[in-house]
């Protein structure tokens, strides 16, 4: 908490923001009930800043139990309702609960074994999950997410990028480029 920061009414705040540490983009058309708003996430579970902290404090242990394996996920709200969203939390965080991809049924990190899908996963590798070419304006957003490192090597993802674009008033485009090390079934979730 920083008491020197003065409150600003939401109507006077920026309608979009790129949270670079966590690689999250948020955009809204306005503050009305029928506004269009969305978020897109593609970063390491504790943010990029955690990489240096893990190295600086060797006795510190990450616990990402509240983070989800949702790199590349997005939520869209328009005209007073969700157009897309996550399916909800079912006790064990799973990639399939989010708007992203699984490969032969395998999702991101080391999901499915408990509450912390990132336990034992190399944070240096997770730190490579990132947004690129983020462009935001009053009329839209375009970005590319490199999601390759969200998946363990055993999953067989050689490269996975997702292009996400929005052009006001309501055109969304999502384009995935995937290169696999072996033939497998790709499942795309849209909730």
Model-identified regions with their sequence ranges:
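Extended polysaccharide-engagement surfaces of secreted carbohydrate-active enzymes
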Residues: 1-191
């Amino acid at each position: 908490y920083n008491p020197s920061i003065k409150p600003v009414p939401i109507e006077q705040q920026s309608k979009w923001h790129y949270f670079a540490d966590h690689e999250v983009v948020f955009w809204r058309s306005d503050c009305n009930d029928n506004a269009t708003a969305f978020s897109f996430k593609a970063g390491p579970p504790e943010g990029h800043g955690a990489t240096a902290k893990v190295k600086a404090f060797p006795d510190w242990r990450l616990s990402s139990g509240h983070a989800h394996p949702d790199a590349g996920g997005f939520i869209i709200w328009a005209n007073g309702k969700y157009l897309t969203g996550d399916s909800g939390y079912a006790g064990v965080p799973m990639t399939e609960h989010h708007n992203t991809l699984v490969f032969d049924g395998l999702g991101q990190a080391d999901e499915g074994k408990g509450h912390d899908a990132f336990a034992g996963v190399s944070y240096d590798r997770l730190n490579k999950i990132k947004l690129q070419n983020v462009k935001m304006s009053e009329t839209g957003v375009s970005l590319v997410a490199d999601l390759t490192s969200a998946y363990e090597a055993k999953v067989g993802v050689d490269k996975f990028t997702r292009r996400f674009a929005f052009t006001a008033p309501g055109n969304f485009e999502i384009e995935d480029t995937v290169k696999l090390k072996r033939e497998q079934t790709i499942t795309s979730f849209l909730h």
